[in-house]
Regions:
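Short, Φ-rich (hydrophobic/aromatic) sequence segments
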Residues: 47-53, 87-91, 143-145, 195-198, ...
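Intrinsically disordered, low-complexity segments enriched in serine/proline and basic residues
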Residues: 6-7
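Catalytic core of non-heme Fe(II) oxygenases with the double-stranded beta-helix
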Residues: 103-184, 189-192, 196-203
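Non-heme Fe(II)/2-oxoglutarate
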Residues: 14-113
């Protein structure tokens, strides 16, 4: 894999030379996931983990447990605000990296239109045997996973067939149309917050 460091410490992990459509423009070209390590993990982890333990009671297709959906304006704890504000502060840079191989008109748009907002999020708890079947988050343009707890043996996140090992305190941002899955976990305790980000563009909402 090729590792390229953007200015604020994130990095790209995919080797686009292995992708079937890597020389084609648009949605058939490679959208590279971008990874950041959160400087606030030690401060926010315990309250957010407890929030998931208390609310993850819906069994998803694949076996994992999830909370209900929350909007980006829902901040049940101060730690939610810390995490959401941090994620939103990174999105413009991350999208610039993700879109660089896509021939997207976004790359030529003015900086004043490059505005994003965290649209929704939910907590996930993976007990032994729990996973998530192959799916995507389209029509959201950007999706993310933030990993709060990843015991040894935790299943990776697989995006477009590429396996990304998850690590505590790590944020993975990727294009919402990208198919992804989590294999059945061999152990219990894998916890994360997933969500989607909307592109505001020149709108005022």
């Amino acid at each position: 894999s090729r590792w390229i460091n953007p200015p604020y410490g994130g990095f790209f992990i995919m080797d686009i030379s292995k992708l079937k459509y890597n020389k084609l423009p648009g949605l058939t070209s490679a959208f590279e996931p971008v990874i950041y390590d959160c400087p606030y993990q030690d401060k926010i982890a315990d309250p957010l983990l407890q929030w998931i333990y208390d609310r993850a009671n819906v069994r998803v297709n694949g076996g994992a447990l999830k909370t209900k959906f929350y909007t980006g304006n829902d901040r049940d704890t101060p730690e939610h605000t810390i995490l959401i504000d941090w994620i939103e502060s990174l999105v413009v840079e991350a999208v610039q990296g993700m879109s660089r191989w896509t021939n997207s008109a976004y790359n030529e748009s003015p900086d004043s239109s490059k505005k994003f907002k965290l649209a929704d999020y939910w907590g996930m708890y993976y007990d032994q045997g729990g996973g998530a079947v192959l799916h995507n988050h389209w029509p959201y343009p950007i999706s993310f996973g933030y990993y709060l707890k990843t015991p040894e043996g935790s299943s990776p996140l697989i995006i477009d067939g590429e396996s990304i090992q998850v690590t505590e305190g790590r944020l993975i941002l990727f294009a919402g149309h990208q198919s992804h899955e989590v294999p059945e976990c061999e152990i219990s305790g894998r916890c994360m917050i997933a969500g989607n980000i909307s592109y505001k563009g020149v709108t005022d909402w």
